[in-house]
């Protein structure tokens, strides 16, 4: 089978098939669980098969002492984990879970075993290595909703639990409709021809790393449409973490309110609000309020990455860049905490990446002052996303030494070095592959999204994976990617 569970004991070579199989769910009713099991039952029906017919599938709401004893009898070690599950597969299939969120993970394992011909009488016990198993994406365009749901179904199949969704200007703001209006105008401008962002950057000598006109497919969806997507995810135990760009990457706000822009030179590309202007926070917090009202999130990613337009207005020029950055994050942190929301931030501006650019030299657009000393002054209950993790363990040591918990962002598992060692030594919650492009199949393939998601899923649920197994796992993931894509995306 594709996954390598913590414990797998095969008791016979007979194949399980489904014929008039009854589902007995002792947990809370779940139409999604029933639908997922019925997919497996219908797709793997074999009434003329001479092997073992599964008569009933039972779903039990707790790991009983008998199940824990069964784990030990089979040579396993029980570990309490809210996402853990046990399977006893035979004439009847029994699913035991610690918490209802584990049910779909158990069902996903059954489906995978059935589809790959590995569903035989056996006992399986499993729980994830990584507590955060996420995927970072843009909001889909209205015409992409079916494809978006197809991707969520894939996350369920490969036992993910997080979707990080960049909001920006791609969701309706009822209090500030001008944000959406200017967002569409901005996206149309950037989409005039390929790589218009780089053209504009060079034309205006503008310090900027990226722009995201793909978000919402260059438009925006209504709050009701967003709630439909949220419901789809929630029903499948996928937690959505809104990614709400703050300070930097704020073009969706700044375009509509150029009076708060730190950059006056180019009204088309002001992407940073002035942290010395109180109106910046009035607008930013209005945006947070609407997003909190729609999503009811446990946590929000405030971004703050690629902060390059630093200290250009008269007020900000008088301040230390480290203080500017620190005060902005703390102000945002305090506001979200007052709303009961935990805070995630990007980590690139918390790192000393070297270089000798100075702040006191008044050259035009030719320096970005360092802000990394602020890491000692920030609240340590924030989670920091390290998307420089591909450069090695040195990228995360200073952040771990400061006391932050980390996530690996822009995760590319096939080339990532020492996953096992680094996640054992540091406070690493997990990782997230990222999609910075559209949802169409051709882009998913070109950008290796299917491959990265499946490879990541394999190591999120595998305690034995290390660098020595890369070649073996690469081949296994390539085969599985081909199988899944052709079954569910074509």
What are these regions (language model features)?
Residues 1-101, 105, 109-125, 345-352, ...:
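Acidic, contiguous N-terminal accessory segments
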Residues 26, 43, 55, 144-147, ...:
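Residue-identity detector for glutamine
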């Amino acid at each position: 089978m594709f996954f390598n569970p913590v414990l797998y004991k095969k008791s016979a070579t007979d194949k399980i098939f489904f014929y008039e199989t009854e589902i007995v769910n002792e947990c809370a009713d779940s139409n999604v669980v029933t639908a997922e099991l019925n997919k497996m039952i219908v797709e793997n029906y074999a009434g003329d098969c001479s092997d073992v017919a599964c008569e009933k599938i039972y779903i039990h709401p707790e790991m009983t002492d008998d199940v824990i004893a069964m784990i030990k009898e089979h040579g396993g070690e029980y570990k309490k984990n809210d996402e853990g599950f046990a399977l006893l597969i035979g004439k009847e299939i029994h699913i035991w879970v610690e918490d209802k969120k584990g049910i779909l993970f158990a069902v996903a394992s059954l489906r995978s075993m059935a589809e790959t011909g590995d569903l035989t009488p056996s006992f399986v016990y499993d729980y994830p290595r990584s507590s955060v198993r996420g995927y970072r994406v843009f909001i889909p365009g209205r015409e992409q909703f079916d494809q978006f749901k197809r991707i969520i179904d894939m996350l369920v199949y490969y036992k993910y639990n997080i979707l990080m969704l960049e909001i920006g200007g791609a969701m309706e703001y009822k209090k500030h409709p001008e944000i959406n209006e200017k967002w569409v105008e901005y996206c149309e401008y950037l989409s005039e021809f390929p790589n218009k962002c780089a053209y504009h950057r060079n034309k205006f000598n503008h310090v900027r790393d990226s722009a995201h006109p793909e978000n919402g497919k260059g438009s925006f969806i209504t709050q009701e449409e967003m709630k439909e997507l949220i419901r789809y995810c929630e029903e499948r135990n996928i937690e959505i973490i809104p990614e709400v760009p703050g300070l930097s990457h704020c073009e969706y706000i700044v375009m509509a309110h150029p009076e708060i822009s730190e950059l006056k030179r180019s009204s088309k590309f002001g992407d940073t609000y002035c942290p010395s202007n109180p109106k910046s926070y009035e607008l930013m917090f209005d945006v947070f309020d609407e997003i909190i009202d729609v999503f009811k999130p446990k946590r929000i990613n405030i971004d703050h990455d690629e902060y390059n337009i630093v200290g250009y207005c008269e007020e900000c020029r008088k301040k230390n860049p480290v203080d500017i950055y620190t005060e902005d994050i703390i102000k945002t942190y305090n506001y979200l905490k007052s709303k009961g929301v935990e805070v995630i931030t990007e980590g690139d501006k918390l790192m000393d990446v070297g270089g000798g650019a100075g702040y006191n030299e008044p050259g035009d657009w030719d320096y970005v002052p360092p802000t990394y000393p602020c890491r000692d002054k920030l609240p340590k209950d924030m989670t920091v996303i390290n998307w420089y993790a591909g450069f090695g363990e040195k990228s995360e040591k200073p952040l771990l030494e400061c006391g932050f918990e980390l996530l690996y962002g822009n995760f590319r598992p096939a080339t990532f070095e020492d996953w096992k060692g680094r996640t054992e030594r540091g406070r690493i919650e997990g990782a997230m592959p990222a999609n910075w492009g559209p949802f169409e199949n051709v882009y998913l393939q070109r950008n290796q999204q299917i491959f990265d998601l499946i490879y990541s899923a394999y190591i999120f649920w595998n305690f034995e994976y290390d660098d020595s197994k890369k070649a073996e796992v690469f081949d296994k993931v390539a085969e599985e990617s081909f199988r899944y894509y052709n079954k569910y995306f074509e």
